[in-house]
Every structure is written in structure tokens, then in C-alpha cells.
């Protein structure tokens, strides 16, 4: 057995590399990292005897190694190889030139007459079998090559790190044969190829993407397999030269998969119950209330949210609310309150955590958010809704926001729409991705949520086309359309987010790993692909701060005949939104600005601008090229720290209205819904609903 490995937590304890080993019966064989951080081979006869051979040289973190073990059953000879393979580029941000290499190089020989007992454990890469059966299966969806259900073993001792070019042979190979096979199965002699049982090249099925969960055995045995729980693909391999930064331009240098012991794509829970909803229920956001013994308390009650959509292809209202479910997924089960070193600094206070936060801190098996780090310190780039998402609950209070965040904050809007008797349908980001502009064109007015931060390419195209086709769009958030997020091509329950070289971000992808596995395109900020948000919605993300929110004052454009109808019932000098449920004001948490240099339409009207933000409200870092004292300060001294309210007309009697603040909707219900934030939004929606040209 052999492979190139790039361990990222070699000191974390026993981890399986290449194993056909059953932990319960101590039978079979396996190549492991042991409890001493060394490479080891284990052979078990299933009768209580286990042979372990260790390299006795510690593996170093973020260093590529060629590792191999050979066992001659006739002679009992065992050989174990551990050799670093370091180049100036292949470790990315890890170690480069290693001196001296012999500190972590090993060649160990031994003799052993113990024979490995055959077992029913599958051959695993990056884990070891604890029990042969788990009663959990993979089939269909992103496992489309699994034509019938395949039962998974209960695995353990999961490896953290990369693996490239694993091989298994049916004879004990010499060192030169190991090195020849490591370079490539196809380049080996016919004699050596005949001895190889499996040669898995993870780059073999790279096309214009590498979304596949199938792994290819390049031998004539075709022992193809599956990667489970979506470890990261499109990863630089042991031979990455940095000549190409895109994996499908030079697939041979992207033969690695990065495995993590906390990867999850699907909890694989069984269905407990189903409930058929009557047709008379209108479109909206609902929840299934679950209770223990019918008791109403935080300890005995939970709410599982879901959306009831209008009949397929039909609109049942003139107004559509697009629920920003991509953003919900990106933040799902985030653990920043317990893990981030800057949580208290961001919030300006000690984070107030809920029971869900504390539970998730202890139960990492529910998976992480794209704001989290894996246990080895690498960023989480996939998020799936096929698991319990404990911070996507109607009663959840997020630790970061001054009040509510994501789904809960968007319920401020639906509550207000109900209060104002404005009929509306609800659809999701996923629906928009699938149906495109045809979905939006069924509605006269389209509303966003408070934080539509994550968008796919098809979603952006739909919003742009809607505006060109006379659509009337109200963007009710901030930090919108900021990060690229793409759906898995075979399973829309899963999104991918790569955090690139710029942006206000929780982590940064390693060099050469900026391109999405799901579509092969550059990940990170839409700005980096020339699609800055202000070209989509007229505003661009400018500042963030999580202590208190502020207010707006009207600008001269608001009094022009084309715009004054939006402010009907609002005084010329009236302070707008110095109240609310999110930080005490309508302008807060995250802010967007009007900027003609960055794509705000030249016909846009600047209606109002926020002021008096604190110094915890800071400008986004992608616009800060030098850190200069006193130049890029907080809200009291930086003119870029502001929320701009805008309005502009689009072709065919279309228009856009946007207040430029994430906390805007939190002010709608103040004073029994009788306030100027509520009045402005009601004027905008009712004006957009009128037939004919706008003023």
C-alpha cells in the first residue's frame, strides 16, 4: 500500500490512511498515523493478536510525504517507508524547504509471521472501519453512480489532511517500484502494472468541474469508489508547481482530496413522519412545532421551518418575497461565538450565546458553517441542509447581531406584510436558481430579505434580467450579492463557497484552491469576477458593525417630483429610523453605499443617508489597500461608513428601491407599525404595484 499524504493534524491521535481493518475484531490490515504521530502498519489475525510496526519518526504538519508499507506473506518481511516530498510550492502556505529531512524520514524493516485475517470491512481511504454495518446508505443525488443503495460502514479514526494517488498491489514492491508507481500507473512497466490491484487517481474524472463523488481506479480491475461526506476536491497535489492556479487547466497537479474528520453532507436520518398540507394554505413561511409531552418550554419545544410555495409555474400574488436560503446555509450551525478569537471584538461585547450555540459547541457532528474552520484549521467550503440546522429556528437569537439575524430577521418583513394586508408569495434562492427570470417575471414586485449575501451565477442573471424587463425590485438588505455560492450540480441541497484572496471573510482558501469544485469557476467575491453588487442592485457593501444601529436623514433628491411620493407622510427634516428591534435603529449591522465609480446607475437618486455610527462600524477590508493610522477609521471619522437609500428607474417602467441597511426591516413594527420606516416601505411597494409609468 502506498500514497502521498499531507497530514494536517498528525498529533491528533490514531487516523486511518489506507485500511481494510475492523476495529471491533482487530482483523485485517491498515496503514495509519498512530497515537505518537508516526506512520504505522497494523496487521490483525482477528484472534487477539495484532502486529504494529511504527516508523518511529514523527510526521510533520503540512508536509507532503510518500508513505508505503509492504508485506510479503511468504517470508513475513515487512517494510515501512516515510519520505518527505517538499518543493517550494507544493505545501501552499505550509512548510517549504525542510532542513534536515532525516528528522522525519524513515525506512523500517521487520519480520512477522502473523497473517491478516480476511474480514468484511470495505477498503477505506482516510478512515478505518469500526463496524461493518451502519444501516446508512448512499444512493442517487450527488452519489448518482450508486445505482442501488450502498450501505456504509460505521467509520472512525478519520484522517485530517490530503491524500494523493493511493495504490494497492498484490505483491511486496521494492522501493524503486513504489516510486515508479507513485509517478503514475500508466507509465509503469507491463510487469509492474500486472501486480497492481488498485490505482486511484483522484484527478482522473476532472472535467470543467470536480463535483463528482466518484473516484476512479485506473487499473483494469475498475475498483471505483465513492467519497463520502464531501471532502474537498480541486485541491493541490504533491506535485503542484503553481504554474497553473485552476485545477482543470492542469488536472495532474490537482490529484489530492482534502479529508476532514468533521465533513458532513447528509445526516442520513430516517423519515419519522410526514404530513400532507391542505391546498388552501397560502404561500408563506411556516414551521412544524415539535414538543415533548405537549409542553411549551425551550427544553421541550422546537420549530422546524419550511416554505409553502405557490403552485408550480403560477403566481398567487403580485408580490414575491425571495427567501435568501443560500445565506441561511452559509451561516448554518456557525460556531464563531465559541471558536472565533474576534467574536467579542466584532460585537463590542461578550457574545450572548443561546442553548443551541452551547449544544453545537459540544456536538460537532451536526456539521459546520462556511464561517467555520475544520478541526485542522482549514476553511469549510461546503454546507448542506440535509442535517439539523439549529440556528435556523424562529426563536433563535444570534450572538453576533444586536438582535436577530438571517431567518429570524426576515420574519420581521413577513410580519409587516401581513400587518399591512399586502398579499405575497414566498420562494427560495434555490427556486430562483432553477427557474431564473421566468420566476421573477410572474410578479410585479419582488422583495429580497435582509441579508441576501450569497448568490449563484444564475440568480444574479435573473435579477439583472428582471430589471431589464420592467421588473420592480425592492432590495431590503445590505451586504447583498457579495459572495459566489454555487449549488452542487447533482444535489441542490448543497452549496459551495470558496473564500478567495479578498473580502470580509472568516478564512482564506489556500493558494491554487480558489476555484469551485461544483462549477470550476473562480470562487470568492462577485466583485473579483467583475460583478460588483452595485451593478446588480445599485449599492455595494461598505461597512459592518455589530454594536448599535443608527438613523437616516433625507437628501435633496428625496424632494424631487420623481421621488417625493416615496416620502409621502414623512417630514422634510424628520429623522428616519432612530428606533427598531435590531440595534435600536434602521441603519445598522451591515451597510451598503451609493458609488458611481463602482457601478451605481447614473440615474440613481440618493434619497437618504445614515449618520452617527460608532467606531465599531468599520469599512470593508477589500477597499483598504494600506493600513494607515487615522485614515480608515470607524463611523465617527470615515465617510465610507454609511447606509445610502436609493431609487432608480429601469427600462420598460421598471424600478429599484433600496435602503442599504441590514437592520431596516427590524424597524418596521415600531410604534404599532406606525413609523416613518414603515411608511416609506409601504409607499414604495404600493407605488410599485400601481399600473402604468412611475412618476
Per-region residue spans from a language model:
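Extracellular glycan-associated modules
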Residues: 1-233
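Solvent-exposed loop/turn segments at secondary-structure junctions
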Residues: 24, 48, 130-131, 207, ...
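Short, solvent-exposed loop/turn and secondary-structure capping segments
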Residues: 30-31, 42-44, 79-83, 90-95, ...
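Structural recognition of the beta-strand scaffold that forms the well-ordered cores
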Residues: 40-42, 124, 198-201, 318-323, ...
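Aromatic-Pro/Gly-enriched surface loop or interdomain linker
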Residues: 230-265, 295-439, 692-693
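Ligand-binding face of N-terminal immunoglobulin V-set domains in extracellular IgSF glycoproteins
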Residues: 259-295, 304-305
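Helical hinge/lid and interdomain linker segments adjacent to catalytic or ligand-binding clefts
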Residues: 262-263, 274-276, 280-282, 399-489, ...
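Glycine-rich, aromatic-lined ligand/substrate-binding cores of catalytic
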Residues: 490-672, 676-678, 687-688
Amino acid at each position: 500500500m502506498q500514497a502521498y499524504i499531507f497530514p494536517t493534524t498528525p498529533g491528533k491521535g490514531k487516523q486511518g490512511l489506507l485500511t481494510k481493518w475492523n476495529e471491533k475484531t482487530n482483523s485485517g490490515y491498515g496503514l495509519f498515523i498512530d497515537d505518537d504521530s508516526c506512520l504505522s502498519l497494523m496487521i490483525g489475525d482477528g484472534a487477539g493478536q495484532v502486529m504494529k510496526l511504527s516508523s518511529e519518526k514523527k510526521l510533520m504538519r503540512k508536509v507532503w510525504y510518500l508513505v508505503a508499507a509492504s508485506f510479503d506473506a511468504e517470508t513475513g518481511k515487512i517494510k515501512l517507508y516515510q519520505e518527505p516530498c517538499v518543493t517550494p510550492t507544493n505545501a501552499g502556505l505550509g512548510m517549504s524547504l525542510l532542513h534536515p529531512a532525516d528528522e522525519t524520514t524513515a525506512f523500517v524493516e521487520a519480520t512477522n509471521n502473523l497473517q491478516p485475517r480476511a474480514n468484511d470491512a470495505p477498503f477505506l481511504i482516510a478512515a478505518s472501519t469500526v463496524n461493518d454495518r451502519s444501516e446508512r446508505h448512499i444512493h442517487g443525488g450527488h452519489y448518482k453512480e450508486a445505482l442501488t443503495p450502498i450501505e456504509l460502514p460505521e467509520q472512525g479514526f478519520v484522517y485530517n489532511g490530503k491524500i494523493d494517488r493511493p495504490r494497492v498491489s498484490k505483491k511486496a514492491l521494492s522501493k524503486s517500484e513504489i516510486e515508479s508507481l507513485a509517478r503514475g500507473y500508466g507509465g509503469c512497466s507491463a510487469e509492474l502494472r500486472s501486480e497492481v490491484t488498485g490505482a486511484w487517481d483522484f484527478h482522473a474524472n476532472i472535467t470543467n468541474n470536480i463535483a463528482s463523488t466518484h473516484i476512479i481506479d485506473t487499473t483494469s480491475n475498475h475498483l471505483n469508489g465513492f467519497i463520502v461526506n464531501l471532502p474537498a476536491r480541486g485541491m493541490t497535489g504533491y506535485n503542484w508547481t503553481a504554474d497553473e492556479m485552476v485545477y482543470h487547466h492542469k488536472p495532474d497537479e490537482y490529484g489530492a482530496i482534502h479529508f476532514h474528520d468533521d465533513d458532513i453532507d447528509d445526516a442520513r436520518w430516517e423519515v419519522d413522519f410526514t404530513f400532507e398540507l391542505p391546498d388552501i394554505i397560502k404561500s408563506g413561511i411556516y414551521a412544524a412545532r415539535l414538543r415533548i409531552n405537549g409542553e411549551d418550554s425551550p427544553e421541550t419545544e422546537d420549530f422546524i421551518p419550511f416554505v409553502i410555495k405557490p403552485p408550480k409555474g403560477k403566481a398567487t400574488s403580485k408580490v414575491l418575497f425571495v427567501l435568501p436560503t443560500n445565506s441561511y446555509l452559509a451561516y448554518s450551525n456557525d460556531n464563531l461565538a465559541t471558536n472565533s478569537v474576534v467574536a467579542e471584538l466584532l460585537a463590542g461585547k461578550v457574545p450572548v450565546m443561546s442553548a443551541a450555540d452551547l449544544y453545537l459547541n459540544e456536538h460537532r457532528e451536526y456539521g459546520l458553517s462556511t464561517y467555520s474552520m475544520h478541526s485542522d484549521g482549514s476553511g469549510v467550503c461546503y454546507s448542506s441542509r440535509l442535517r439539523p440546522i439549529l440556528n435556523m429556528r424562529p426563536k433563535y437569537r444570534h450572538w453576533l447581531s444586536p438582535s436577530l439575524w438571517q431567518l429570524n430577521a426576515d420574519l420581521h418583513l413577513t410580519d409587516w406584510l401581513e400587518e399591512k394586508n399586502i398579499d405575497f408569495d414566498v420562494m427560495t434562492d434555490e427556486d430562483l436558481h432553477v427557474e431564473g427570470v421566468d420566476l421573477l417575471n410572474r410578479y410585479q414586485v419582488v422583495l429580497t430579505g435582509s441579508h441576501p449575501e450569497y448568490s449563484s451565477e444564475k440568480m444574479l442573471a435573473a435579477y439583472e434580467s428582471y430589471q431589464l424587463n420592467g421588473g420592480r425590485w425592492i432590495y431590503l438588505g445590505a451586504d447583498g450579492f457579495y459572495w459566489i455560492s454555487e449549488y452542487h450540480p447533482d444535489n441542490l441541497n448543497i452549496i459551495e463557497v470558496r473564500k478567495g484572496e479578498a473580502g470580509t471573510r472568516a478564512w482564506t482558501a489556500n493558494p491554487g484552491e480558489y476555484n469551485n469544485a461544483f462549477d470550476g469557476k473562480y470562487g470568492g467575491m462577485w466583485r473579483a469576477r467583475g460583478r460588483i453588487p452595485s451593478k446588480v442592485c445599485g449599492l455595494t457593501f461598505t461597512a459592518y458593525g455589530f454594536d448599535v444601529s443608527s438613523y437616516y436623514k433625507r437628501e435633496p433628491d428625496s424632494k424631487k417630483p420623481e421621488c417625493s411620493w416615496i416620502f409621502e407622510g414623512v417630514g422634510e427634516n424628520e429623522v428616519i429610523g432612530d428606533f427598531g428591534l435590531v440595534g435600536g435603529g434602521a441603519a445598522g449591522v451591515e451597510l451598503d453605499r451609493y458609488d458611481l465609480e463602482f457601478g451605481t446607475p447614473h440615474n440613481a437618486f440618493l434619497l437618504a443617508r445614515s449618520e452617527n455610527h460608532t467606531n465599531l462600524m468599520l469599512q470593508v477590508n477589500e477597499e483598504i489597500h494600506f493600513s494607515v493610522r487615522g485614515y480608515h477609521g470607524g463611523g465617527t471619522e470615515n465617510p465610507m461608513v454609511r447606509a445610502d437609500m436609493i431609487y432608480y428607474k429601469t427600462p420598460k417602467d421598471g424600478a429599484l428601491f433600496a435602503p442599504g441597511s441590514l437592520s431596516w426591516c427590524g424597524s418596521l413594527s415600531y410604534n404599532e407599525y406606525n413609523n416613518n420606516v414603515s411608511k416609506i416601505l409601504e409607499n414604495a411597494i404600493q407605488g410599485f404595484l400601481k399600473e402604468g409609468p412611475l412618476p
